[in-house]
Amino acid sequence: MSKKLHDNERIKIESNFLRGKLVEGLNDNTTGAFIPDDVQLVKFHGLYQQDHRDYRAERKKQKLEPLYSFLLRARLPGGVVTPQQLLEIDRIASELTDAGSIRLTTRQTFQYHGIYKRNLKSVFQELKFKANIDSIFTAGDVNRNVICTSNPMQSELHAEVYDWSTKISEMLLPHSNAFAEIWLDGEKVHETEQEPIYGETMLPRKFKTTVVLPPFNDVDVHANDLNFVAIVENEKIVGFNVLVGGGLGITHGDKTTFPRKADDFGFIAAEDILEIAKAVVTTQRDLGGRTSRSHARTKYTLETHGVEKFKGEVESRSGIKFLPSRPYEFTERGDRIGWIKGTDKKWHLTVFIENGRILDYPGKPLKSGLVEIAKVHQGDFRMTANQNLIIASVPESEKEKIEALARKCGLINDAHSKQRFNSMACVALPTCPLAMAEAERYLPGLVTDVEALLTKHGIGDDHIILRVTGCPNGCARPLLAEVGLIGKAPGRYNLYLGGNTNGTRLPKMYKENIDEAAIIMTMDELIGRWANERESGECFGDFVIRAAIIAEVIIASKDFHD
């Protein structure tokens, strides 16, 4: 007997191509929330329903419903915006969100937090009509925001991978008019709608796509379902290696869930990229599991059906045969903070945004300062998959002015360490409903403690790739870090060790459910050993494996939990 489909499949089937009862829910002023089915559907429109968890207990005591609000994630393939768009993004954050911030994300876009239901349509309409930005398919069981290498040194090649990311994004958008009808007061469609790529039930689960320019792995290919790795010959992109089946999300206590590195299917010509993307997506649509949400990502489809079957299906659907993979190498993935001169002779300033949170802080008015830069900047802005921002294409004549403005508001801070630049956290508490522990609010202090340990052991100029998430879904990609912390309960985390600096190895759990004091005590001991016993140039992740502190993950489905 076949297993029962997960209830989310019913919701999608009954939704009339993602409409549900959202219009009725918007007009219901008795609550700040949507009905349960529609809470799932709004994700496809780029929204997550949340409540402020710091206020839950007090509101319950006062017999009030939770303080519901919404997160909106913008669709911004490749993460590029103009100064005019950034000014509108800033204005909307200030006028229509409770948080008042712009949150850069690991998906190379931005989020708004704290949008009350009464303001949702206004935010959608202001974004679309004033900034020409939408949030279609940035969440839900679909292809999410397509991300690409943002390092601006090779300007012409970056332009090409950015162009492909936008083309893939456009091709994998829905045909349904539901978004325009509900949020933009668009005309209703009366004829029967079709979704040729997604069908009525969309994909089994989220699907993430990247376009990558080696040697930079800033997008973390092994966190994604589909990756196109550019192969460059004679300074031109001649095609792509196609990597399929990466993903990091796990479930605490469920050893049938595991992170997985993507498999290299082979090489394709550049002109075949869209057909291959469509074939991979539709293969996952038809072969992916729909009974268990925790086993529905592409990585499990490959484990269940085998790489060769999945690959053969992609070749059959696309009519394209994979050629042998071409050689490439990833050597780094962190953003190069500071000024870089591109091949286009223009300057690009990468500024560090701690946790990606653009807001005016006491003595550090990042948000206001960015507005002042946008008013005079002649190039564009590029968001990175490491939650930072590139002020791109600055002419030599404007460089001094841009630097002065960036320093004035704290966007350039020479006191920041390499450790801080290489640390990252998800949002977690107080707004994320899945968070089991702090992440964004915990990270700054944790980094200060780790900086002190590095200095104590005489290696203050070195760094460890450190990432923290409040739950095991992995938004900040801790399972590709040298040190990953995954929230287990308030103030308690699972500690993972053994990833590497270029993002090509998964870490393994070293200690389970430890508190913050135990984390620092453990890191003190490990950093001390690393400082004293490492080989020349040996990174922390390589050291803990060579020293047999932790075993290397070879095949995650077999040895990640051992």
Curated annotation (Swiss-Prot):
One of its GO terms (biological process) is hydrogen sulfide biosynthetic process. Pathway: Sulfur metabolism; hydrogen sulfide biosynthesis; hydrogen sulfide from sulfite (NADPH route): step 1/1. Binds 1 siroheme per subunit. Binds 1 [4Fe-4S] cluster per subunit. InterPro entries: CysI, NiRdtase/SiRdtase_haem-b_fer, Nit/Sulf_reduc_fer-like_dom_sf, NO2/SO3_Rdtase_4Fe4S_dom, NO2/SO3_Rdtase_4Fe4S_prot, NO2/SO3_Rdtase_4Fe4S_sf, NO2/SO3_Rdtase_FeS/sirohaem_BS. It catalyses: hydrogen sulfide + 3 NADP(+) + 3 H2O = sulfite + 3 NADPH + 4 H(+). Keywords: 4Fe-4S, Amino-acid biosynthesis, Cysteine biosynthesis, Heme, Iron, Iron-sulfur, Metal-binding, NADP, Oxidoreductase. Alpha(8)-beta(8). The alpha component is a flavoprotein, the beta component is a hemoprotein. HAMAP family: CysI. Belongs to the nitrite and sulfite reductase 4Fe-4S domain family. NCBIfam families: CysI, PRK13504.1. This is Sulfite reductase [NADPH] hemoprotein beta-component. It comes from Psychromonas ingrahamii (strain DSM 17664 / CCUG 51855 / 37). The lineage of its organism: Bacteria, Pseudomonadati, Pseudomonadota, Gammaproteobacteria, Alteromonadales. The gene is cysI.
